[in-house]
A protein has these predicted regions:
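A generic alpha-helix propensity feature with a strong bias for hydrophobic helices
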Residues: 5, 20-23, 65, 155-156, ...
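Short, contiguous, well-structured surface segments enriched in hydrophobic/aromatic residues
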Residues: 26, 30-96
Length: 219
């Protein structure tokens, strides 16, 4: 049976059937509410026993996947499509709406090439990613994920060592990427507020927003 109470509360087309600007704002606000719920659940923390002591842990990789997904979703609304989105489009959104240089082109490249794609296909927990970019001389990156909200959200640190526990042989790395999920979450959320202000004021962005709606909700 349909949830008529929820329908009444939301209203037809989020309460703005004849106001595309306010519909866009209400739509993005609704997506942000879901994103915030997911992130709060992931970062709430549970206690687990490690080496005879209790430590607080979190759902780090579901949280990271949620951040990447929301960033791509906002990018799709910004550029007018969800199909065929790539790093170039995400970088354009990031440069426009996310703090710089925290989310410059190289940071977005690492976030998506090393983490987003691996999470989508393999649900990574540990490993070493070899950076094939011509400027990095084949640096070998591993990672550590935190729940806190300090800056920078993504930081590449020189840290030469060897992974010994998970791999079947010693696996060398030269750098460690620190990912701070609380900061990533807050920055993406704040970027959406900036995007919403622009889409209400700019007809070109409204056009691209509704082009994306055509893909998400085909007539």
């Amino acid at each position: 049976m349909p949830n008529t109470t929820k329908k009444r509360r939301a209203g037809l087309h989020r309460g703005f059937p004849d106001n595309p600007e306010q519909f866009a704002r209400a739509f993005v606000t609704g997506r942000l509410a879901g994103f915030t719920k997911d992130m709060r659940i992931c970062l709430r923390g549970i206690r687990k026993r490690v080496n005879n002591r209790w430590v607080l842990t979190h759902a780090y990789f579901p949280a990271l996947m949620s951040c990447c997904g929301m960033l791509e979703y906002l990018t799709g609304l910004y550029v007018g499509r969800t199909n065929g989105l790539g790093r170039r489009e995400v970088t354009a959104y990031a440069i426009k709406y996310l703090p710089q240089p925290d989310y410059n082109a190289d940071v977005i490249r690492i976030l998506f090439d090393a983490f987003r794609n691996a999470l989508a296909h393999r649900g990574i927990a540990s490993g070493v990613w070899v950076d094939r970019h011509h400027a990095t001389r084949g640096r070998r990156l591993t990672w550590k994920v935190f729940a806190n909200a300090t800056r920078p959200p993504i930081e590449v640190c020189v840290n030469e060592d060897v992974l010994k526990i998970d791999p079947p042989w010693p696996c060398r790395y030269t750098h460690r990427v620190h990912i701070r999920l609380g900061r990533l979450w807050l920055d993406i959320r704040n970027s959406a507020n900036g995007y919403m202000a622009d889409v209400v004021a700019c007809q070109d962005l409204q056009k691209q927003f509704f082009q994306c709606m055509e893909e998400l909700y085909p007539r």
